[in-house]
């Protein structure tokens, strides 16, 4: 009987140790979990039928509807607890026939861009998202604007500041994005 109780106690201790070791993953922060998921996930491809462009997004992102979305727009998001990461694409008319330099200056000013990078037919802006009253928030954006005739194709990513490292794969996808 003593041997049986000893074995039961030993099994109980082993199970408790195993649970405590495997429970550590649940103690990871959301940015750590997201970074791990981004390393392991496969990328899906969305094709826009209206403008014939494609966008790659993580398989665990959910395609979400937005009542303000117009023709040529798509939105993919990840939401857990208070962490929201949104990847979106839209097409905008270049009604003022702005050159690449003029558009970069205009949008950098409107979006309070802290970093700007110009390419051959595109530019990239990034910075903090500002609240309506002008205050900086703890969220950031990264956006690529691609010029094609009288249109701007824009792919953007918004994310919490503490997820900067975790979204690097998505930022690289945006950097590599070609409309056609």
Predicted regions and their residues:
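Hydrophobic membrane-insertion alpha-helices, especially the h-region
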Residues: 5-20
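Hydrophobic single-pass membrane-insertion segments
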Residues: 19-28
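Surface-exposed amphipathic alpha-helical segments
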Residues: 61, 151-180
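Conserved polar/disulfide-associated segments of primarily extracytoplasmic proteins
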Residues: 64-162
């Amino acid at each position: 009987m003593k041997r049986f109780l000893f074995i039961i106690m030993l099994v109980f201790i082993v199970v408790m140790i195993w649970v405590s070791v495997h429970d550590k993953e649940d103690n990871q922060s959301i940015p750590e979990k997201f970074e791990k998921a981004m390393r392991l996930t496969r990328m899906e491809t969305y094709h826009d039928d209206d403008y014939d462009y494609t966008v790659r997004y993580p398989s665990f992102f959910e395609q979400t509807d937005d009542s303000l979305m117009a023709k040529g727009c798509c939105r993919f998001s990840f939401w857990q607890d208070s962490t929201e990461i949104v990847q979106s694409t839209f097409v905008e008319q270049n009604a003022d026939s702005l050159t690449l330099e003029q558009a970069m200056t205009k949008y950098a000013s409107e979006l309070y861009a802290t970093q700007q990078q110009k390419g051959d037919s595109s530019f990239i802006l990034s910075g903090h998202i500002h609240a309506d009253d002008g205050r900086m928030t703890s969220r950031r954006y990264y956006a690529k604007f691609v010029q094609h005739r009288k249109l701007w194709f824009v792919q953007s990513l918004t994310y919490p500041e503490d997820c900067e490292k975790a979204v690097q794969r998505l930022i690289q996808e945006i950097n590599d994005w070609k409309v056609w």
